[in-house]
Structure formats: structure tokens, C-alpha cells
Amino acid sequence: MNLASSLGIENPPKPLVDFKDLIQERAGAEGGAFIYNPKVDDIVDKYGVIGPDGVRMLVMGTVDKGGSGCMCPGSAFLRALLRHLMLNEKSAVILDMEAGIEHLGRGTTRGMDLMIIVVEPGARSLETAERIKKLSSEIGIKHIAAVINKGGAGKVNARLEELGIPILGEIPFDQQLMQADLEKRAPIEAGGEAVNAIVKIKEKLMETVEEIRKENEASKK
């Protein structure tokens, strides 16, 4: 669980999809009728693990088998939880999705205020970023931005600008970050150029989120 160790969480939470009895109780059994909108408002407090900086982590897991996804009790449970988190939670919610576009095809990320694409310095990564922008628009995600990973901004930066994808910043390749990962330490403990860049990206991200918040409030008037 790389994300857990990055957050300084030594014992990551068990994936929610592994709680078969809970899913059956809330959403129904496999192969039969199931509840499309099960009760999920207590899941964060009961199954989330809090990191040293106050971040609460939940691991969803996956229930998709072949094709574009299944509609089953486990899937209904996870979708209901995501809707609850994005519509009812007062805190910021960050979804760390698998690399690629599969979650966009399943509509898992529908309703997000901002999609952040991590772009590697290569042609395939840029092609994926272009597809993500298109698919995000199709499911109603109005705002996307990119973070360039491992340096090599030059042509990557220019191509992202051509695509109309704002850039939050660039994380340079940093041996200190790699060493921290090998030692299962949170990146922030490593210091160095990469961490300094991440701090700047965080500041720009907060500014972007605030602008989106104001835009959303204005649209409701």
C-alpha cells in the first residue's frame, strides 16, 4: 500500500470490498435483488484510518470483472459511498484512482470538482492526458489540471498548453524521495527538491480549489 506509507500510515485499512458481510447487510447478496442506494453515512468513521497529519484514509478496492464494470451489491455499495463523500462530506475528498481511463468509463469519478492528471514525460502519457480531458468533459467534470512527474517539463509543458490543460507544477526526479519510499517513510520526511515542489503544487492547488468553490457558489445564485 504505497499510498498508505506515503501518508505515514503503517497499517493501511482493509479494502471495503473485502467486508462481504457488511456489503450483504447494506446492499444485498450476490445473484439476487440488491439495494441501489445503501446506507453508507457511517462508513468513514468506522472503517477509515487516520494518518499522523489528520488525513483519514479509506481503501475502496474493486469489484469489476471484465468489460466496463458490473452492477452488483459491491458496486452499488462503493458508488453510494462515493456519492456520499462527494456530496455530503464537509472536508476535502481526494480520490487516488488507478492510472489510465477505466474509472472514467465506469463513471466512478462523476461529480468531482477537479480532476488532476499526473503526466509522465512521454508520448503515451500525453495521449492518455488528452483522452482523460475528453472523457472528463463527457461525464461532467468541468475542471482538470496536470502535475508533471519526474521532470522533463519542456515539450510536455508545451503539449499540455496546446490541449488546454492547466499545469499545477512539476515534481523533479529526486533520489531522496526514492530512498524515503524504500524505507516506507512519508515523502514529506525526506525533504529535498521534490518535496519543495510538492509544497508549491499544494499551494497552487488550494488557490485553484478556492476559485472553483467561488465559481460553484456563483452558479447557484
Language model segments and positions:
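Conserved catalytic-core segment of NTP-binding enzymes
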Residues: 73-179
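Phosphate-binding/switch loop-helix module in NTP-utilizing enzymes
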Residues: 34-99
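N-terminal phosphate/diphosphate-binding loop that engages ATP/GTP or pyrophosphate donors
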Residues: 1-53
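A short acidic, helix-capping loop that chelates divalent metal ions and anchors anionic groups
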Residues: 66-67, 178-181
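C-terminal alpha-helix
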Residues: 197-212
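C-terminal boundary of histidine-terminating zinc-finger modules
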Residues: 183-192
